[in-house]
Structure formats: C-alpha cells, structure tokens
Curated annotation (Swiss-Prot):
Allosterically activated by AMP and inhibited by ATP. It comes from the Bacteria. This is Pyruvate kinase. The gene is pyk. ATP binds at residues 34-37, 73. Pathway: Carbohydrate degradation; glycolysis; pyruvate from D-glyceraldehyde 3-phosphate: step 5/5.
Length: 466
C-alpha cells in the first residue's frame, strides 16, 4: 500500500471519462484543475466527470482548483520569436504592441513604477536576464545581461522588486465561484507573497458561503521572507519549484524545499512538491535516474504528495508516469523510518497526544492507528511522524473524507454518524475489519478528542479487535 499521495493535472491528454477512470484505478488521489488554461465550461466538465467517477467507484478522490494568480507575461510578437543579444538595449512597455527585437509589451501597468535602476528582470523562466537602466511612465529600458530567444507571452519575474499586483485576479474570482458551486476540496493560490494574500483568498471563498481549504504555492522570493506567517494561515503548502527556481538561485532550491517542508510539518500542514517530477516522461516512456532520486528525496524530506503537471496534462505517457511515480514512492517508503520528523509544539496538547500516539503504536507494534475525526486535523497531526502503521481516519463528514486523500499514510473511511462516540468507534472498527485492514486479535491505537469537538485531540486508547 502506497503512503505518499499522487496529485495529477487533468489536461487535453487526460480529460476524457475513460482516462480519468484509468487514473483513479492507478491510484491517483487528487486531481488538479489548472485554471491558467481553459474556460469555465471546460473546467466544469472535468469536475463533473471526476465527481461522477469517484462516486461510482467509492474512492476518496479529491479535486484541487489551481488559481492562476497574477502571472506577469510579455505580449505577442511580430514574428514567432526574436533573439536578444548580450549588451543590447531592450525595452518593456505597458502599451499594447506587437513586439520585436527592441521592444515588447508587458501586462503589468505598474511595472515602470515598481522597478528601479539596477533591478534584475528575468524572462522565459530565467533564461534571459535583463538589468533596468531607466524608467518612464510607460517603459522600462534595460540592458541584456544574458541573451536568448523569446516567443509569445513568456513569463516575467522581478525577484528584487515588490510588485504592485493583486493577489487574486478577476479570472481567479470566476474560478473560485466555480469551485464553491461544485464544493471542490481545495484551492491552490499562486504567487503568494504575504499571509494577507491567503486571508484574502479565504474571504473570497466565504463570499460564496463556503469554507474550502487554501493551499499556498511558495514560488516567490517574497514568500520565503514571510514563510512561517504564510504557513500558519494556510491549510496546506505547495513547493512550486518552477517559478521558485527563477526567483532564487537555482542551487538553493533543494535546501529551500527541505526548509519549507520541515516548517510546514512543524505546523501540521500537508505539503505537495511540484514541478518537473517526471519531466522527461512528457516525451519518453522511462524516467531519468535523477528524476527517480528526486522523487525519493522529496518523500524523505516529508512530502505528503507529489504533483504531476505537464506529464499528465499534455504528455505522451500519462499513465506510465503515474505508474512510475507510484512504484518509486513505494520503494522509498520502505526506508522512511530513517527520516522521521520528531519536532512539535510541546505546549500544544493535541500535538503532544499525536506524538505519543506514534510512540505507543511503535512500542506495541500495533496494526493500525485509528483517528475518529470531524475536521481531519487529528489524522494530519499523526501522519507527520512517518508512522509505520496506516492511519485510518474514521469520519462522518464527506468533505473530510475527500480532503484527507491528500495526507500521507492516511486511509479515509466514511463512517456512519452516531450520537455516542463508543458506538461510532465500534461501527468504525467493524468497517475496518470488513475492509481487510485489521483482523481479530490485532492491536490498534486510537486517538480522538473528548467530547468530540473539532481540534481537541486529547485521548489515546489501545484496543484489541475482537
């Protein structure tokens, strides 16, 4: 049984009913809807297909809507591409024009005010480096430090400046409306720079009468400066290594990844690692050795889930990529005992109980850890310790059942709601037996809250299945 969860992007290659069904059968836990592409109707159809199939198959499969955010891009060119040469002058303008080798438009009107002489501007995922030498009301004049080819609508990064961009765009608001309409499990927020961005997203969601978890994508230098504050107000974190590797020196990405995961785990927030997980499999049927090693190291770092993007959205081998990721994850998990997280807030009762639950389950060689839960928080806290046993999260809440599909080691089980906790546990144990997860004579460690309120994990019990 694989503990690490797999998140896959649904795109042109995989948005058919048949392909989504095959992906669920291969063990995909969360489907990502990328709102950088496609319209409302197109994305709604994906959601409806996933919901229909997960109900049909009785699988805890979640849906994550990834909000595109305020991505800064260059405009269209007169030709397919232009080549910039080192030392030449190149201008960025806020006017809408067709660009050439001397000038190109950008979609951020405040850019000339936001940057200053000496700032670095990166184009095309950092492949082209510009240095600001002069600004006017509508233009930013630069000198090319590292040249290369640019095509239409390339990404623009300015790691040294605090840009005046809205954290949520009008397009994002439309897709928040779509997600709340269909009660998706998660929203991912792009280009988070400060905790206020996350709080603003949550407020937008509440305008539609819903409370849906927000996963903050850490992909800017500004986010790293306020990382702990962002983690505290987020419901999960995504290490978005693509833009992050442009905003900071690329050699720092591995260390920063470890730091983000470690801090997220301290605060018991699920973590997704994304970008170029199996990049070579977009074209090739087999991964590189480096990709396989990267997957294992992300799991050793403590990642709850790994995200495939173009590999499943447009790649030639989407199903093979899922199979490879699953196989590598299972193999890496055999050695997780050497990479255990033990840091926690010792002043927090729920955290201390969860830590003790891990220790007790190891000492007794228990078959399972069972966490009756309303919100899912107990299961998330226990999972961060890389426990050897599966964590069965018994919940009467359908939304929690689906959301826990993102959390490593957790097996969500939808259990019948009961007025008495003991009755709920007894029925849950019976269901666990029926699923083949435990049998008579097995020891299970159970941790829950009394009197069953959200966020009050304060009890541990050891039960024998009979």
């Amino acid at each position: 049984m694989r503990s690490t969860k797999i998140v896959c992007t649904v795109g042109p290659r995989t948005d058919s009913y048949e392909m989504i069904e095959k992906m669920i059968d291969l063990g995909v836990n969360v489907f990502r809807i990328n709102t950088s592409h496609g319209d409302w109707n197109e994305q709604e159809q994906k959601i409806l297909k996933i919901k229909d199939l997960r109900e049909k198959k009785k699988k805890p499969v979640a849906i994550l809507i990834d909000l595109a955010g305020p991505k800064i891009r260059t405009g269209y060119l007169e030709k397919e591409f232009v080549e910039l040469k080192e030392g030449q002058i190149f201008t960025l303008t806020t006017k809408e024009i067709l660009g050439n080798e001397h000038i190109v438009s950008v979609n951020l009107s405040s850019l000339p005010k936001d940057v200053k002489k000496g700032d670095t501007i990166l184009l095309s995922d950092g492949e082209i480096v510009l240095e600001v030498i002069e600004t006017t009301d509508t233009e930013v004049k630069t000198v090319v430090k590292v040249g290369g080819k640019i095509t239409h609508r390339r990404g623009v990064n300015v790691p040294t400046a605090d840009l005046s961009v809205e954290s949520i765009t009008d397009r994002d608001r439309e897709f928040i409306k779509l997600g709340t309409l269909h009660d998706v499990e998660f929203f991912a927020l792009s280009f988070v720079r400060k905790p206020e961005d996350v709080l603003k997203a949550k407020e937008e969601i509440r305008k539609h009468g819903k409370e849906i978890p927000v996963i903050s994508k850490i992909e800017t230098k500004k986010a790293l400066e306020r990382l702990e504050e962002i983690i505290k107000v987020s419901d999960g974190i995504m290490v978005a290594r693509g833009d992050l590797g442009v905003e900071i020196p690329i050699e720092e990405v591995p260390i920063v990844q470890k730091e983000i995961i470690k801090l997220s785990k301290y605060y018991s927030k699920p973590v997704i690692v994304a970008t170029q997980i199996l990049e070579s499999m977009i074209e090739n049927p087999f991964p590189t050795r480096a990709e396989v090693t990267d997957i294992a190291n992300a799991i050793f770092d403590g990642a709850d889930a790994l995200l495939l993007t173009a590999e499943t959205a447009v790649g030639k081998h989407p199903l093979e990529a899922i199979k490879v990721l699953s196989k590598v994850a299972k193999e890496a998990e055999k050695k997780l005992e050497f990479f255990r997280t033990i840091e926690y807030d010792t002043s927090d009762i729920s955290e201390a109980i969860s830590h003790a639950c891990w220790q007790l389950s190891e000492s007794l060689n228990a078959k399972l850890i069972i966490t009756p839960t309303i919100s899912g928080s107990t299961a998330v806290r226990v999972s961060k310790y890389n426990v050897s046993q599966p964590i069965v999260a018994l919940t009467p809440e359908e939304k929690t059942y689906y959301r826990l599909s993102l959390v490593r080691k957790v097996i969500p089980v939808l259990a019948e709601k009961c007025s008495q906790e003991l009755e709920f546990i007894e029925k849950g144990l019976k269901k666990v037996e029926e699923m083949g997860l435990a049998e008579k004579g097995d020891l299970v460690v159970l941790t829950s809250g009394v009197p069953g309120k959200v966020g009050t994990t304060n009890t541990i019990r050891v039960l024998k299945v009979d």
